[in-house]
């Protein structure tokens, strides 16, 4: 499972790099850097790198190829270990890695369609949404392989209220990120609100672009407030330190995103801050999805657990009470059972039998 976890982490890293670079392609207007040619760039897989937009677009395509290879390698590794616990079957690494490969192929095909359609906004939005789904599946694969706190989270249950709250947070994050992609691509939406946190007015922008920008902002604000509530609730309930840590990370990223957004508007949308804004948005989606998935699997017993070895009867014989050996081994076992604490509960009948045996031995 350790090897699979490493494969999954590599796939996650390549996926994140590919998504961030895809955001740079949109922000820099390099989506048509290779014209309407796909998969080749002006008839060649290795065109002359003589224009910035061509360099950005072809690098994005190279990263897509590396990503597909990483996903296929993860799938092959999972297939070879399909008989291992936590790999095959429902909730296993094999199924999620297969879904990741399918989504990777779908994203590549949507990229081709987007290029052929001239990089229109809604084709780009569909491509971006599939990419968000892909990174979510890769995150789920990492967690199923025991990464990102997945192994330890399964050992502690969380309430249904916590699970519902984390799912709501992930849904809001996905909507905010998708609307952010539409804001970056829809004509005039990125400059529709010249002020922050208030919108202000831009007479050169149509109403539809303003509505897209405001929807993106309100979703981001509601998400941060919701994550703050999740963190406060977890601090009060003390259900799982891993869930609390994941919620705190998501909240911190949300606050950082608001600060980056304010700086970006105040500095009139410099490309560097726009790229950072997109990268932080992807990070928030990853964090909130991981939080929701960790809460979903908490205490369900799926995936990999540390093996629990039951004590042998010979280990109990002669153990005594308080660490001292006893010459009456069955009496020692009975007294030990009668004085069990709450961490190893006995049924009522077995507890009563243990007490009776202990008293009979005394008499």
Question: What are the roles of these predicted feature ranges?
Answer:
Residues 1-330, 334-336, 343, 353-363:
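Polytopic transmembrane helical bundles with strong interfacial aromatic enrichment
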